């Protein structure tokens, strides 16, 4: 079953709103001056906390029970990542050179597809797992932020 969400943000905003049929269903919000990002989708709440300096790892925590759910490990070139979640491995990757399309897949194929266009975008999911949907969205925004930081220091 295909589920579609739309998302939007504002220029220089740390907050992304997620909609389904024009009804707000969730958000992803980065705390200022912090490595913590909270996300919510359909009442499922999660915290992403990134550790490391050159080799990053993100811990995924369920905010309802404050339980660890998994983590994200990034490749050195930051074009692919591995999500370890519920004792299963998922692959996250950019799907085009512009980095405006990305996806999450498992051994059976693509589970979630994302597409961005400036300050808006679409999420098409073939799973109802809100945590996995939010994780894929978080990873792209984390890598985009890291790329911007590198460009700013160059």
What is each of the regions a protein language model found here?
Residues 1-35, 41-43, 67-69, 74-154:
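Low-complexity or membrane-interfacial segments used for flexible interactions
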Residues 36-65:
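Short, well-structured hydrophobic secondary-structure segments
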């Amino acid at each position: 079953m295909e589920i579609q969400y739309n998302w939007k943000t504002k220029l220089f905003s740390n907050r992304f709103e997620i909609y389904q049929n024009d009804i707000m269903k969730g958000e992803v919000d980065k705390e200022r001056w912090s490595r913590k990002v909270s996300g919510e989708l359909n009442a499922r709440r999660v915290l992403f906390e990134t550790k490391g300096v050159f080799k990053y790892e993100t811990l995924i925590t369920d905010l309802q029970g404050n339980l660890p759910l998994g983590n994200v490990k990034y490749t050195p070139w930051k074009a692919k990542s591995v999500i370890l979640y519920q004792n299963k491995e998922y692959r996250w990757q950019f799907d085009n050179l512009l980095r405006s399309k990305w996806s999450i897949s498992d051994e059976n194929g693509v589970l979630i597809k994302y597409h961005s266009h400036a300050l808006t975008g679409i999420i098409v999911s073939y799973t109802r797992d809100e945590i996995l949907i939010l994780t894929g969205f978080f990873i792209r925004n984390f890598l985009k932020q890291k790329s911007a930081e590198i460009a700013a220091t160059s």
